[in-house]
Design a protein with these regions (language model features):
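Membrane-embedded alpha-helical segments of integral membrane proteins
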Residues: 1-30
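Transmembrane helix-loop junctions in multipass membrane proteins, especially transporters and channels
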Residues: 35, 64-68, 254-262
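Internal alpha-helical transmembrane segments
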Residues: 40-51
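A structural signal for short, hydrophobic/glycine-enriched beta-strand patches
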Residues: 50-237
Length: 271
């Protein structure tokens, strides 16, 4: 229920949907002779589009998320690594085969690097079919084939392909590997996604060390006009809005213990 509701909710509140709604309302209002209302909505829509596409607003919105957890020094030893899906183009892989990756490919690249550095560590790839409207190959399934092509095999590999969201990533990963007290596990995911991910793993009773990757912000970039990359700017705003709304929804539904999880939190004993 939560999965379906979250997908439908996001369909209507993502920035492009809100901008389209504002445009349609303004057209309808003008057609009905409500000129002031139409002008107001068209003006608001134009301003929001300009802010999202032609300023560094997205960078500002993402920065607190990406800076929340910093990557520590490499531990001397670890017991395992959990990498969260979201780096594969599941719909394309379903229709064309292969294992096409997207802009979050840093997640799996860093995991493979860590796997070589820690040859005894268990590796959990957590990523099921998170799409709602189209057929998709789960990231865990595609990654199994990718690992095989790179001769990365063995009984230390675990592929969790049931999860559809971040909370299920945590719950099903914990069920699969049953981490013991005192073990050291790294959690690999995009930096902007790390606060919500760590919060979910804590709530599931799976203590992890955050290992953020896939950074997209510059700490030295303040709010300013940016005319060079409107599509990239709009994409950053969309990602940031989705993540902040996700944090609020997860906190409200009890899937994380605080609105913006921070370093030093405590895992729930027993999940």
């Amino acid at each position: 229920m939560f999965f379906a509701a979250s997908k439908i909710f996001w369909l209507f509140v993502q920035p492009i949907s809100l901008l389209l709604a504002g445009l349609l309302v303004s057209i309808l209002a003008i057609a009905l002779g409500w000129w002031r209302l139409g002008l107001a909505f068209s003006s608001i829509t134009t301003v929001l589009l300009a802010l999202a596409g032609f300023t560094t607003l997205g960078n500002i919105m993402l920065l607190p998320l990406e800076d929340r957890f910093t990557r520590p020094a490499l531990p001397a030893r670890i017991d395992g690594i959990v990498v969260l899906g979201g780096y594969m183009e599941g719909e394309i892989n379903a229709s064309r085969g292969g294992h096409e990756v997207n802009g979050a490919a840093d997640r799996i690249i860093e995991t493979m690097r860590l796997a070589r550095h820690y040859p005894e560590a268990r590796i959990v790839v957590s990523g099921g079919e998170g799409t709602f409207f189209e057929d998709s190959v789960p990231d865990a399934i595609s990654t199994r084939a990718l690992f095989r092509d790179f001769s990365l095999t063995g009984d230390r590999l675990f592929f969790e392909d049931r999860s559809r969201n971040t909370y299920e990533n945590a719950v099903y990963s914990r069920e699969m590997v049953k981490p013991q007290p005192g073990e050291t596990w790294l959690l690999v995911t995009s930096a902007f996604h790390m606060p919500r991910s760590v919060g979910c793993f804590r709530q599931a009773g799976f203590p992890v060390i955050a290992w953020p990757v896939d950074y997209s912000t510059r700490p030295d970039r303040h709010f300013t006009i940016d005319l060079q990359n409107p599509l990239g700017n709009l994409t950053q705003v969309t990602i940031a809005m989705r993540e902040w709304l996700g944090l609020a929804a997860y906190w409200f539904s009890g899937k994380i213990g605080e609105v913006l999880p921070a370093p030093g939190g405590v895992s729930v004993v027993g999940g």
